[in-house]
Amino acid sequence: MGKYIEQYKQMYYCGDMLFYWLGDICKLIDLTEAKSLLDFGCGQGKQYCGWGDLDAHSTLGMMPALYDPGVEQFEKMPKGKFDGVYSTDVMEHIPEEELPESLELIFSKADKFVYLAICTSPSMATLPNGENAHCTLEDIDWWKEIVNRYRPTDILTHIRTYNQHDQSENFEVIA
């Protein structure tokens, strides 16, 4: 894993996309009675530090473990498994050939649920090398197919895709 990691280390992603999907994640926490969480691709983690009136861990009811290979402070994967693993605005940044490894890692850390929010349109951000920050742009059916290849059948999985340009969304539950 890591074709673009050095590129992302030069950028400053704060983690604010999580706020769009907190409602979905909170429903999964309640449904599964989750007691531990992992934010896979947390960015700089500012969403957990009280950002004005916004404070994600208060909304979630707990502080998640944080992982982001592009941020030095969070580049080490937390040990153990978690009831829930969520990843928002991350998968589209991973090259297609590296997705199997990433999905296997995500599912290996989850005991009850996985939530993926994935953008399906080009990013407004450009990497330092000039490439668009979203390198894997596919529709929800494609994502559902690849996720199903790596998803254990006992892990409740929700996929939300969205297009940031036309504000369209799709939602799939894989039970």
Walk through the language-model features, giving the residues of each.
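Conserved N-terminal segment of class I S-adenosyl-L-methionine
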Residues: 1-84, 97-104, 109, 120, ...
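A short beta-strand submotif of the Rossmann-like class I SAM-dependent methyltransferase core
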Residues: 84-90
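Short glycine-centered segments of the SAM/dcSAM-binding site in methyltransferase folds
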Residues: 112-115
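N-terminal substrate-binding region of glycoside hydrolase catalytic domains
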Residues: 125
